Amino acid sequence: MVQPDSSSLAEVLDRVLDKGVVVDVWARISLVGIEILTVEARVVAASVDTFLHYAEEIAKIEQAELTAGAEAAPTPEA
């Protein structure tokens, strides 16, 4: 019988900080059609280096989308 590899808490924490974890929560509580409570949360756990790397990549994607949208929009003729 093969034992699965066990990981220590330090190894798990190192992996989470290296790769990053995002937990996105959206919940609504209502009673008889009346909204009582809405919760929206996004929790990000990552090292600063990992966060900055992915923030740069997201900025590049958003800039490419803006550029593509500007090129596709018709220009008004005078």
Swiss-Prot record:
Annotated spans, Alpha helix 2: 48-67
GO molecular function annotation: structural molecule activity
Any one GO CC term of the record: gas vesicle shell
Region (Beta turn): 32-34
Subcellular localization, as worded in the UniProt entry: Gas vesicle shell
Region called Beta-strand 1, residue ranges: 23-31
UniProt-annotated stretches for the region Alpha helix 1: 9-19
The family this protein is said to belong to: Belongs to the gas vesicle GvpA family.
Subunit structure: The gas vesicle shell is 2 nm thick and consists of a single layer of this protein. It forms helical ribs nearly perpendicular to the long axis of the vesicle. Modeled as antiparallel homodimers.
Name this protein carries in UniProt: Gas vesicle protein A
Organism of derivation: Haloferax mediterranei (strain ATCC 33500 / DSM 1411 / JCM 8866 / NBRC 14739 / NCIMB 2177 / R-4)
Originating gene: gvpA
